[in-house]
C-alpha cells in the first residue's frame, strides 16, 4: 500500500469516526443540549429554561426571543425533524407544536415615505430570497396571543403548515377554531381558554379610531410586499369582538394569492348573524404607490328577507380614497375621503335605480331613483334624502329628510312627507309641486333627536326630548306632541305623548323593554271626525302590560248618547275586556247597553257577559224591554273520569205579552272523550235527532229536579251569553256572564227546616278557539263587617290538546253552613274558613295545593264515630253500629292539602296528602260528656291505599296513630 493510500484510509477513518462521534453526541440528550446552547449563543439568541430530547425530537420550555422589536414567548415548543432532509435541498420539519404562544409587537409603526427613505424594491427582493426550501408539514398551537399597544388578538386551536421556497411563502390548509379580538389596555397574565377573563373594557374611541383608520390607508398605500404569498385555504369557525357582539362572525373561509404585488382574492366567505357575503377579485399595488382594486361581492342581509345583492367595488386609493360601488343590476355609490387632511372632508352619494325590499310576504317597500347624500367633515356633516316611497297596499308618498350631525349626535332639522294618489309624471323632485297633481294632505314633523353610541359598552341611546307632528291627513287634522327616549339597557320610555284628532284628545305613556307597560286614554266628543253624522261622547282606556313576548291588555269603553242619523241610538254603553295576545281573544268580556233604539225598535237594556273554568262553563245574556224579556244561560260540565263533556241550557226565560216560557237544566250537547288516559281526541256522540231530544228534555228536566231534590232554591238571576259552534267541529267561541242575587236555600231534614242566604254570585266564562277562562265570586252577606266571600279563577289552556290548567281560589271568612244543603252525612255544619287553593298542571295530571284555616267549626252527626273507626283497623267491626249523637267543636284549626299525579307504567295515578292541625278541639258524646284535646293528623293516599300518622292529645293521656296501607 502506497503512502497516499495509507494517509487517505486513515483520514477517512478519522472523518467517519468524527462523524459518528458527532452523531452520537447529538443523539444523546446531554450532547444535543450543549450543541443547541453553543449554536444558539452565537447565531440565534433564543433564551430557554429547559431543553430535552435529541436532534430528531426535542422540546424547549419557557422560551423568549426578540427580533426587530418583536417579542416571542411560549410555554413550550415541541419540534420533530426529518434527519434525512437535512442533507437535501429541502429541509423538512415534520411537526411543530407550541403551547401558550405570545407574540408582542412593541414598537410603533412609523409613517415612512418609501420613495426616498426606504430600500429599493429589487434590493429587498434580493435580501428576502429563500435559497433552500423549508417545509413545516404540521403546525399546531393551542393558544396564540398577538399583542399590540391597542389590540389583543387571541387564536385558539390553530392547525396549519408552511412552505418557504425561492421568493414564495405558501400557507398549507389552515384551520382556526376561534379568534377573539379585544383591547390591550391592561396586561394579560394568563391565557387559559376562550372563556378566560382577560378581556377588558375600552375608552371612548371615536376620534382616535378615525385617525388610525385613515392613517392606515395613507401609510400602507405606499407599501409593497417583497415576497409572494400563497394562502391555499383558511377556515375559521368563529370570530368574536369583545364588547361589540354585533360584529361577531360565525364562520370565515378564505383563499388568496399575492404575486408580483398583485393580490388575487380567490374566495372570501363570511357568515354573520346579520349578513352573508361571498367575494372575489384583485388588488394591484402599483409602482407609483397607488392601489387599484376591483372586487365582486354577493351579499344577503337578514333584515331584508335574505335577498341576494350583487355588488362591484372598483376604484383607486391615492392621497384620497375615491370609491365607487356598482350593483350589477340596480344601484351605485361613489364618494371621496381625504387621507392627508386631518379635518377629513367627506362626500358620499348613494343612488339606487330601483330599491326593492321585501320586508315580508305581503309587505314590500320599493322606490325608483333613490338618492342619499352626505357631505362635510367627520365631526360636522350634513345629510339629505329625497325620494318617493311605495309600500304594497298603501298610497305612495314623498319623503324629504334633512339633518346635521357629528360622531355622537344627529339633529334632524326637518322631516317632510305627503301621500299622493295619482300617477307620477316626472322623476324630478325639484318640480314635484308643479308637475304632480296630488291631494294636499301634508304632514310635517319637526323636532330634535340625539343619538349616543358607545360601541365599547354595546349601548346606544336615542333621545327625542321634543317632537311635534301636525297637519292634515286624509282631510283630517292631526297633531301629536310629546317626547320619547330609547336606551338599549332599559328599552323605550314614553314620558307622555298627547294627540289631537280634530277636537278629540288622547294620550299615551309608559315603557317598553323586556316587559311592556303602556297606558292610554281617549276622550272623544267630536265623533263626526271619525264618521259623518255620528254624535255622542266616548271615553276609553287601554292598558298593555306583562312580557313583550306575551303581553296582556285590559280596556274600558264608556259611551253616552251615541246617535247615528237618528237611526241607531245608545243612551249608555259600557264594555270591558281583558286578554292576552297569545290567546288572540279577550279573556274576559262584559258589555252593558241601556236604552237602545234601532229605527222603531226599542230595548231597555242588554247585558252580555262570559267566563270559563276547566270543569264548568257558563255564558249569559239578558235582554229587557217593556213587552219582551229574554234571559239565557248556557252551562257546560266536563266529567274527566268518564270522559264526557255535557252542555246544558241552564235557563231560558222568555216573557212576552202573550205569556212566559221557562226551561231549566236541559241537556243540549254531548261530547265523548275517546281514550280516557290521554283525553286528547274529542268527538261528538252521534244523535240523529239531537234537537228534538233537547226540546223533549225541556219539558221534564225542571219537574224532575223539583221532585227529587230536598233543597228549595230561589234566586234572581241575570246572564249574558254568546255561543258559536259548527257542526262536526269543536266549539270555537263561548262567552258567558252569570249574576245571581238574593239566593235563598231551604232544606227540610227530620221535620226541621234549614235556611241559607247568599247575597251574590258572579261567574264569568270565556272560551274561544282553544282556551277556557273563568272567574267567579260568591258573597255570603252584604252587611257583614268582614269580607265573607269566595273568589277565584280557573283556566284551561290548549283545551282540545294539552289541557293545561292554572287557577286560584281565595276563601275570606266564608261561612260553611251552605254545605248542609249538599250532603247527607252530617246533621249540621257551622263555622268559617279562609285560605287559598292553587291549581296547576293539566287536567290529566293536576297539581293542587291548599292552605285552609278553620274558625268556630261545629259538626253534628250520629256517624262521626263510624267514620273515625275507618282509620283504625284494630277495632272490632261491630262497634261502628253504635249510633249516638256526636259533636265536634273546633275553635281554630289548619289543613294543608297537596295533590299530584305520578306516571307509572304509562298510567297516571293520583296521590294526595292532608296535614291537619288544631290545638283547640272538643268532642261531645253525650250532652254531659265533653272531651277537650289537640290533634295533628297526616293522611296520605296513593294506589288506593291510605296512611294515617299523628296523635290525639287529651288532658290525661295521648293517643298516637300509625296506621299504614289500609283500605276503605
Curated annotation (Swiss-Prot):
Keyword tags: Membrane, Transmembrane, Transmembrane helix
Where does it live in the cell? Answer: Membrane
* Gene Ontology CC annotations of this record: membrane
Question: Topology relative to the membrane, per the entry?
Answer: Single-pass membrane protein
Task: Write the protein's name.
Answer: Uncharacterized protein BUsg_080
Keyword Membrane appears in the UniProt entry = yes
| Similarity field | To E.coli YtfN.
Detail the disulphide connectivity of this chain as listed in its UniProt entry.
Answer: none
Transmembrane portions of the chain: 12-32
What is the protein's major site of localization?
A: membrane
Amino acid at each position: 500500500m502506497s503512502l497516499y493510500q495509507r494517509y487517505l484510509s486513515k483520514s477517512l477513518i478519522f472523518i467517519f469516526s468524527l462523524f459518528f462521534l458527532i452523531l452520537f453526541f447529538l443523539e444523546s440528550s446531554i450532547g444535543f443540549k450543549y450543541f443547541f446552547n453553543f449554536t444558539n449563543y452565537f447565531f440565534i439568541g433564543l433564551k430557554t429554561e429547559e431543553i430535552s430530547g435529541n436532534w430528531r425530537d426535542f422540546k424547549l420550555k419557557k422560551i423568549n426571543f426578540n427580533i426587530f422589536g418583536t417579542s416571542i414567548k411560549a410555554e413550550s415548543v415541541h419540534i420533530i425533524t426529518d434527519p434525512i432532509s437535512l442533507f437535501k435541498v429541502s429541509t423538512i420539519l415534520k411537526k411543530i407544536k407550541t403551547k401558550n404562544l405570545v407574540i408582542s409587537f412593541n414598537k410603533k409603526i412609523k409613517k415612512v415615505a418609501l420613495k426616498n427613505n426606504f430600500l429599493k424594491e429589487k434590493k429587498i427582493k434580493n435580501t428576502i430570497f429563500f435559497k433552500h426550501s423549508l417545509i413545516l408539514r404540521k403546525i399546531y398551537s393551542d393558544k396564540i396571543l398577538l399583542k399590540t399597544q391597542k389590540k389583543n388578538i387571541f387564536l385558539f386551536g390553530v392547525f396549519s403548515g408552511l412552505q418557504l421556497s425561492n421568493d414564495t411563502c405558501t400557507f398549507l390548509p389552515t384551520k382556526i377554531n376561534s379568534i377573539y379580538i379585544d383591547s390591550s389596555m391592561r396586561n394579560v397574565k394568563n391565557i387559559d381558554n376562550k372563556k378566560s377573563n382577560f378581556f377588558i373594557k375600552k375608552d371612548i374611541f371615536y376620534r382616535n379610531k378615525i385617525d388610525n383608520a385613515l392613517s392606515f390607508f395613507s401609510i400602507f398605500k405606499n407599501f409593497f410586499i417583497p415576497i409572494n404569498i400563497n394562502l391555499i385555504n383558511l377556515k375559521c369557525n368563529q370570530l368574536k369582538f369583545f364588547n361589540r357582539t354585533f360584529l361577531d362572525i360565525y364562520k370565515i373561509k378564505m383563499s388568496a394569492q399575492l404575486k408580483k404585488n398583485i393580490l388575487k382574492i380567490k374566495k372570501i366567505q363570511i357568515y354573520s348573524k346579520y349578513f352573508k357575503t361571498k367575494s372575489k377579485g384583485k388588488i394591484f399595488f402599483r409602482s407609483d404607490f397607488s392601489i387599484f382594486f376591483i372586487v365582486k361581492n354577493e351579499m344577503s342581509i337578514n333584515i331584508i328577507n335574505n335577498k341576494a345583492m350583487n355588488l362591484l367595488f372598483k376604484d383607486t386609493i391615492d392621497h384620497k380614497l375615491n370609491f365607487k360601488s356598482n350593483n350589477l343590476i340596480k344601484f351605485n355609490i361613489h364618494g371621496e375621503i381625504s387621507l392627508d387632511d386631518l379635518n377629513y372632508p367627506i362626500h358620499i352619494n348613494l343612488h339606487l335605480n330601483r330599491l326593492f325590499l321585501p320586508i315580508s310576504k305581503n309587505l314590500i317597500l320599493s322606490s325608483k331613483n333613490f338618492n342619499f347624500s352626505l357631505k362635510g367633515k367627520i365631526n360636522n356633516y350634513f345629510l339629505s334624502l329625497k325620494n318617493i316611497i311605495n309600500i304594497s297596499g298603501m298610497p305612495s308618498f314623498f319623503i324629504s329628510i334633512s339633518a346635521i350631525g357629528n360622531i355622537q349626535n344627529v339633529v334632524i332639522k326637518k322631516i317632510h312627507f305627503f301621500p299622493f294618489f295619482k300617477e307620477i309624471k316626472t322623476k324630478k323632485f325639484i318640480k314635484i309641486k308643479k308637475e304632480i297633481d296630488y291631494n294636499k294632505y301634508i304632514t310635517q314633523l319637526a323636532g330634535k333627536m340625539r343619538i349616543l353610541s358607545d360601541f365599547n359598552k354595546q349601548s346606544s341611546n336615542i333621545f327625542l326630548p321634543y317632537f311635534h307632528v301636525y297637519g292634515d291627513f286624509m282631510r283630517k287634522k292631526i297633531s301629536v306632541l310629546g317626547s320619547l327616549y330609547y336606551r338599549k339597557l332599559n328599552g323605550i320610555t314614553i314620558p307622555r305623548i298627547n294627540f289631537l284628532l280634530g277636537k278629540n284628545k288622547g294620550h299615551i305613556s309608559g315603557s317598553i323593554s323586556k316587559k311592556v307597560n303602556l297606558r292610554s286614554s281617549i276622550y272623544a266628543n267630536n265623533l263626526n271626525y271619525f264618521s259623518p253624522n255620528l254624535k255622542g261622547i266616548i271615553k276609553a282606556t287601554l292598558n298593555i302590560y306583562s312580557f313583550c313576548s306575551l303581553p296582556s291588555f285590559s280596556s274600558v269603553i264608556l259611551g253616552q248618547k251615541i246617535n247615528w242619523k237618528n237611526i241607531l241610538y245608545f243612551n249608555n254603553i259600557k264594555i270591558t275586556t281583558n286578554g292576552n295576545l297569545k290567546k288572540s281573544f279577550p279573556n274576559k268580556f262584559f258589555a252593558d247597553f241601556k236604552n237602545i233604539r234601532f229605527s222603531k225598535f226599542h230595548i231597555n237594556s242588554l247585558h252580555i257577559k262570559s267566563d270559563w273554568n276547566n270543569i264548568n262553563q257558563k255564558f249569559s245574556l239578558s235582554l229587557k224591554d217593556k213587552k219582551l224579556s229574554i234571559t239565557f244561560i248556557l252551562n257546560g260540565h266536563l266529567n274527566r273520569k268518564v270522559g264526557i263533556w255535557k252542555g246544558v241550557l241552564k235557563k231560558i226565560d222568555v216573557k212576552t205579552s202573550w205569556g212566559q216560557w221557562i226551561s231549566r237544566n236541559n241537556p243540549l250537547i254531548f261530547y265523548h272523550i275517546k281514550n280516557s288516559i290521554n283525553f286528547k281526541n274529542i268527538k261528538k256522540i252521534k244523535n240523529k235527532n239531537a234537537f228534538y231530544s233537547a226540546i223533549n228534555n225541556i219539558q221534564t228536566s225542571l219537574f224532575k229536579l223539583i221532585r227529587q231534590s230536598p233543597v228549595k232554591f230561589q234566586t234572581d238571576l241575570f246572564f249574558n251569553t254568546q255561543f258559536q259552534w259548527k257542526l262536526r267541529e269543536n266549539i270555537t267561541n263561548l262567552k258567558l256572564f252569570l249574576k245571581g242575587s238574593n239566593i235563598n236555600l231551604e232544606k227540610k231534614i227530620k221535620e226541621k227546616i234549614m235556611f241559607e242566604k247568599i247575597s251574590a254570585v258572579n261567574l264569568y266564562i270565556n272560551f274561544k278557539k282553544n282556551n277556557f277562562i273563568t272567574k267567579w265570586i260568591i258573597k255570603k252577606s252584604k252587611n257583614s263587617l268582614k269580607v265573607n266571600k269566595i273568589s277565584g279563577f280557573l283556566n284551561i289552556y290548549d283545551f282540545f290538546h294539552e289541557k293545561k290548567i292554572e287557577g286560584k281560589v281565595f276563601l275570606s271568612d266564608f261561612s260553611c253552613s251552605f254545605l248542609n244543603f249538599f250532603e247527607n252525612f252530617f246533621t249540621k255544619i257551622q263555622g268559617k274558613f279562609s285560605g287559598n287553593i292553587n291549581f296547576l298542571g293539566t287536567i290529566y295530571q293536576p297539581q293542587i295545593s291548599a292552605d285552609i284555616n278553620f274558625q268556630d267549626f261545629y259538626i253534628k252527626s250520629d256517624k262521626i264515630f263510624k267514620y273515625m273507626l275507618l282509620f283504625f283497623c284494630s277495632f272490632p267491626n261491630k262497634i261502628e253500629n253504635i249510633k249516638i249523637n256526636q259533636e265536634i267543636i273546633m275553635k281554630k284549626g289548619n289543613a294543608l292539602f297537596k295533590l299530584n299525579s305520578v306516571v307509572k307504567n304509562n298510567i297516571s295515578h293520583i296521590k294526595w296528602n292532608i296535614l291537619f292541625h288544631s290545638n283547640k278541639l272538643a268532642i261531645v258524646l253525650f250532652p254531659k260528656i265533653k272531651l277537650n284535646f289537640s290533634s295533628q293528623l297526616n293522611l296520605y293516599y296513593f294506589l288506593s291505599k291510605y296512611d294515617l300518622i299523628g296523635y290525639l292529645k287529651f288532658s290525661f293521656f295521648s293517643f298516637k296513630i300509625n296506621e299504614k296501607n289500609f283500605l276503605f
